[in-house]
Each structure stands twice: as C-alpha cells, then as structure tokens.
Regions:
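Bacterial Sec-dependent N-terminal signal peptides
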Residues: 1-41
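An edge-strand/N-cap motif at the start of beta-rich repeat modules
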Residues: 29-63
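Short beta-strand elements that form the blades of beta-propeller/WD-repeat-like
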Residues: 36-47, 84-94, 130-147, 195-204, ...
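Post-signal peptide N-terminal segment of secreted/secretory-pathway proteins
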Residues: 52-173
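Beta-propeller fold detector
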Residues: 63-75, 112-121, 163-180, 227-230, ...
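Repeated scaffold domains used in trafficking and secretory/extracellular systems
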Residues: 73-84, 117-132, 178-190, 274-287, ...
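Beta-propeller blade signature
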Residues: 103-105, 151-163, 213-260, 312-334
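Long, well-ordered mid-to-C-terminal structural blocks that present hydrophobic/aromatic surfaces
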Residues: 294-298, 305-368
Length: 368
C-alpha cells in the first residue's frame, strides 16, 4: 500500500485477560514487491451482511463497483482500522461476547490477504496508539468494597501491528471515581496527536462499589435505584445510580506516556455534554484532530435523553441534560479547552436534529 500523506478535513452527520488466540496466516507480506496501490481511496463497505473493500481513483465522478475494484471478505467486519502504509485491521463486535478480527495487507496484485487472525476480550471502543491497535471495555476487577461489590476497571487489549503479539494491562486500572466525582466511566475513541493520546471519558453513574465507597458523591438519594430496571446495557439493580449525574460536561483524558498506567491530565468543559455516539454498549468516537494537532470534541447532547422515570419505577429521578449538539476545541500543545464553540443544531444549514456520530474524512495523495 504505497501511499498516504493525508489531507485532513472534518465531517459530521446527524445522528483483563490476554487475547485468547492469534494465528499467523500463510503468505506473509513482502513489502518490497508491493505494487503501487491502484487509486487514491480505500473504501470499506458492508451490504447484506457481506463486507467488501473497494478502491477508487476519485470520489468526485464516475461509479464504483466490486467488479475489478473490490474484494469480498468471508469474515464479517464491524469496524475497519487503517494502520500506516502496510496493514489494515477488520474487527467484529459480537455484542457481549469476545471480539474477533484479522490483520490484512495488500499483496503484489493489490488483493487483500490476511496475516493474522485473532480473538480478544469484548470491546466497546477502539483505536491506535504507537505500534498497537487498542480496544477497551470495562469489567469487574479483583478489588472489592466491604460488602463484596467489585470495583469496575478498564480492560485494555493491545494488538501489536509490527509483530502480531498481543497483550493486555497487567494491573487493575480502576474506572471508578476516575474524574473525582465518584462515578464509573468508560472511554470513547482514541486520537494520537502532538506526541500524546487523547480519549473521551464518558461518566456512567455510580456502581454499587461507588455508592458504598463514596456516599458523599451521591447528589440525591432519588438518583439511587431501589429495585431492578432498564434493559440490555442499561439494566440496573437496587443500590446503584444507573446514569450520570453530570450530563452537561465533557471530559478528555490526555496521556503522555506509552500505556494507560500513568495518571492522565483531564480537560473539562461545561459547554457541551459528554462526547461520544452510542449504540447499545458500543461507544463511538466523536473526537478528531486536524492537520495542526488541534483536537475537536463533538457532543450529541445525549444527556437530554435521560428522561424522568415513571411514577411507579424503581428509580425516582435522573439528571437530565440540557445542552444541544456542539463542538469545542483543545488547541495543539494545550491541555485545556479554548473559547471555540459551535452549536451544531442552530448553525447555518443544520437540520435541527442532534448529532449521532461523526467521522474524520481525508483524501489520500499517492507518493511520488
């Protein structure tokens, strides 16, 4: 895949264990005999449950077809991750089960070939950091409170893109009280820029462990469930706060090292709500950097969906957000938000609907 040099732009639409296995496939890549890639665009698509990888010389005109321009994949792919000039990864989200996927390269005939197959712990978001493709979810740790409730922690998976090895964090990294407000959190998306890693931190309410350990962080007993309710990833039981008490704040964790063991710097703003898209337990990335290293943080204002419970529910009240979809910025070289703000629902040409997901679009220019 002899190309790159990204020209970046932003586009928005409304809307701990080791890896279980890693298998080295035959036909390892020999990058010295790769042809120049035909076309400046690589386009993953899914139709009817089948995944394809297409190539195109232009997105401005003409048509594109899987015939002579595409490769059908036997494996179902939920997300594609492009890593430098040599590899691209396809990973499959399997609801609450383990994730699966593969590492691919283009052979001398520009046909995708699989280098590695892998199975790994369930994930809720993903990205790249250094030599690794990373995924993360949250789950129970070995740490418990006086009542035996397990503390929630981050479960990181690292797939090394250079040699195919896999690993995970070897010590518990708590997701409890991560922001100092008693709530458990998760992460949504990863951005490498300015020699640092940025990730959006999503507050998720207080677990049983959190309520018992930091009772002073409970803003109102009305927010604590008195029985079972909700469904799926939103299911809760008595004694926990099932949704955040801080829906109108966004948080970005900034890491300067090479792993998540370090203490990050937390940038906070009250101009927008927490920054992510969400579908069930998947948290979609809504933070992106531009060519100059400025980080743009998008929020759909999801806190507004925390509607008040019915009168007979096992939960008396929730904190409902008020902020609309918006975008703010952390300038390159800074660890704090600046004054930039844009209301995405009232800007010129806006539909008035909230943002669901956003993507970072780029064009690719071939090397000379």
């Amino acid at each position: 895949m002899n190309k790159k040099n990204f020209m970046l732009g932003l586009g928005a639409f409304c809307m701990g264990g080791l890896f279980m296995g890693c298998q080295n496939e035959e036909n390892d890549p020999t990058f010295s005999n790769h042809n120049n890639f035909k076309g400046n665009y690589v386009i993953p698509v899914t139709a009817g449950g089948t995944s394809y990888l297409l190539t195109a010389e232009s997105l401005d005109e003409g048509k594109i077809s899987v015939i002579e321009n595409g490769k059908e994949f036997q494996d179902q792919i939920s997300y594609w991750i492009f890593y430098d000039q040599n590899y691209f990864f396809g990973i499959k989200y399997n609801d609450g089960s383990q994730g699966t996927g593969g590492c691919y390269y283009l052979d001398a005939n520009n046909v995708p070939q699989k280098k590695y197959s892998y199975t790994f712990n369930r994930f809720t978001t993903y990205g790249t950091w250094g030599d690794n493709v990373i995924t993360v979810s949250t789950g129970d740790t070995k740490q418990t409170d006086s009542k035996g409730n397990a503390a929630q922690g981050f479960l990181f998976n690292y797939l090394n893109a250079k040699n195919g090895t896999t690993s995970t964090n070897q010590q518990d990294i708590l997701a409890e009280n991560f922001l100092g407000n008693g709530e458990k959190v998760t992460m949504a998306g990863f951005v490498e820029a300015n020699g640092k890693l940025y990730t959006s931190i999503i507050p998720m309410g207080m677990s049983h462990y959190g309520v018992n350990t930091w009772p002073d962080k409970v803003l109102s007993q009305d927010y604590v469930a008195t029985g079972t309710g909700g469904s799926g990833s939103g299911k809760y039981t008595a004694g926990q706060i099932p949704s955040t008490q801080y829906p109108d704040n966004a948080y970005i964790a900034i890491y300067s090292g090479s792993n998540f063991d370090e203490e990050p710097v937390i940038a906070t703003t009250d101009k927008i709500g927490f920054a992510c898209g969400r579908m069930r337990s998947q948290y979609y990335q809504t933070i992106w950097s531009d060519d100059d290293g400025n980080l743009y943080v998008f929020s759909g204002g999801y806190g507004r969906t925390a509607t008040q419970p019915a009168a007979d529910a096992n939960l008396k009240a929730k904190v409902q957000g008020t902020l609309p979809s918006g975008v703010v910025r952390i300038p390159a070289g800074s660890t704090a938000f600046d004054e930039y703000y844009c209301n995405l629902e009232t800007m010129s040409g806006a539909s008035g609907h909230p943002l669901f997901r956003c993507w970072h679009f780029w064009a690719i220019s071939a090397r000379s």
